[in-house]
Amino acid sequence: MQKNDLVTVAIEDIGVGGEGIGKVDGYTLFIKDAIIGDVVEAKIVKAKKNYGYARLMNIVTPSENRVEKPACPMARRCGGCQIQEMKYGAQLAFKEGKVRGNLERIGEVPTELLDKVMQPIVGMEEPFHYRNKAQFPIGTDKEGHIITGFYAGRTHSIIPNTDCALGVAVNQKILEIILHFMENNHISAYDEEKHKGLVRHVLIRYGFKTDELMVCLVINGEKLPHAEKLVDKLCKISGMTSITISVNKAKTNVIMGNEIKLLWGQTYITDYIGNVKYQISPLSFYQV
């Protein structure tokens, strides 16, 4: 196999990064966005001695477990979701099989014992819009427009998207308010290569039991100009409880700074796990 070869591959497995795995004449290929059961046409982009990587060019025969349309139109470009093309039930079966296989192969747990003690994987009633926390990088596109979204896989290139299918629906409204505020008031986005610009990230938290909302802007400075204009828009959103800034002037990939400054409301939101009440600040660990 050589780079740029065009091959037809039947996908038999999925790798740890969500890439489809298939073989051509015994040669293993890893193909992003292909799922188990697909027969695809792929172009080899990197060829090593015993395996290679290929780009999905065409789906010859789709898997019976392939969805017609992923929930997020950015799924293939964004680095956040790897197997959104697969039906949710098939995702669960794949994950359960991966855990079982690792326990047998790596942990050397006898199959007979697993058959007795391993319970079926428990899925969610709603596998979208379930995350109570999201962190969105802020940047600019080639035309200089301020954008937000998530990074493309293994890059720091932002795929513009304010409507992530994993976060709560109100995130989109919050992000669009912030983007408009920045554009209208000439607030710069942070450039991590030049270490210039002000707004680095936006952190949003939501309490599913309390409906409380938190917005925290991470900035490369001590102050957010015209903050009162942003607060005036955000505080009108139902459930808004906390609006803060996080000061992070370090040249680092660490998102949050240690200093939190209050703009409006309080510095935390509350939520419950069972009967236990939690106070959650911008810096708190709280399972997403």
Question: What is the meaning of each model-derived region?
Answer:
Residues M1-V288:
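Accessory RNA-recognition modules of RNA-modification enzymes
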